[in-house]
A protein has these predicted regions:
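N-terminal low-complexity, acidic/polar interaction/targeting segments
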Residues: 1-236
Length: 236
């Protein structure tokens, strides 16, 4: 059951923000500078805004049609204003939403009406445990393969170099955290974001990381974002 519709400022990006993941932003466009100012001054309460991924072949300026339906809120953690008026932001993904409609006339930036997108209920910790174990194993294989390709040697990646951020994460949120430090295609990350079944989500991330580990090992290749979005931090 979805919640009531709420209003959220929207920041279209060429990436998918996942709950619990960190997202640094370098803000230089005037409209998003204004969004940052509105967040910092409290004009927009809660210091949160929505991040929506731009569809392949579309532009951030294409409005509602150019965005995926499901996005994630970003919580503003740190703000550094640069002398020329630009901003460096540190944000963290929080809550998933589904776009209802988008207003491009009220503010310099997009403002969206959204419905919150909760997880399905029913899976117990016991149900999820084997899927979580398999996902963690796939994540370690991916990280070990990446470590070897970067000159780390032929053995297992040392335990003290493994990202332990997900050690105490509950299984329903685990897939998002594991995906946070892997270079996965935008389509994979978007599918992961849209999936509301924790068990299916763990299976999705396991398959994605297994495939990417093979590509790393055999082709020494990883997915790279489109050049149109390859700018400092994330585009705006």
């Amino acid at each position: 059951m979805v919640d009531v519709v709420e209003t959220l400022p929207l920041f279209p990006l060429g990436t998918v923000l996942l709950p619990g993941a960190s997202l640094p932003l370098h803000v230089f466009e005037p409209r998003y500078r204004q969004l940052t100012i509105d967040l910092v001054t409290g004009t927009i309460p809660g210091k949160q805004f929505g991040v929506g991924a731009v569809r392949e072949g579309w532009s951030p300026d294409d409005g509602r049609e150019g965005l995926h339906d499901v996005g994630c809120t970003a919580s503003l953690r740190e703000v550094r204003r640069l002398p020329d008026g630009r901003f460096d932001l540190q944000t963290t993904g929080d809550r998933r939403f589904r776009l209802v409609d988008v207003d491009d006339s009220t503010a310099p930036y997009l403002v969206a009406n959204v419905e919150w997108l909760p997880d399905d209920e029913g899976d117990t910790p016991t149900d999820l445990a084997p899927f979580a174990m398999a996902a963690r194993a796939a994540h370690r294989r991916y990280c070990t393969t990446a470590w070897r390709q970067q000159g780390g040697g032929d053995g297992e990646m040392p335990a003290d170099l493994t990202d332990e951020a997900a050690t105490d994460v509950a299984d329903p949120e685990l897939a998002h955290i594991l995906a946070g430090d892997c270079l996965l295609p935008l389509s994979d990350r978007q599918e992961l974001l849209e999936e509301t079944c924790p068990m299916q989500r763990l299976q999705l991330i396991r398959r994605s990381m297994t495939r990417e580990a093979v590509l790393l090992a055999e082709l020494r290749a990883v997915w790279a974002p489109s050049a149109k979005f390859a700018v400092e931090h994330s585009p705006n």
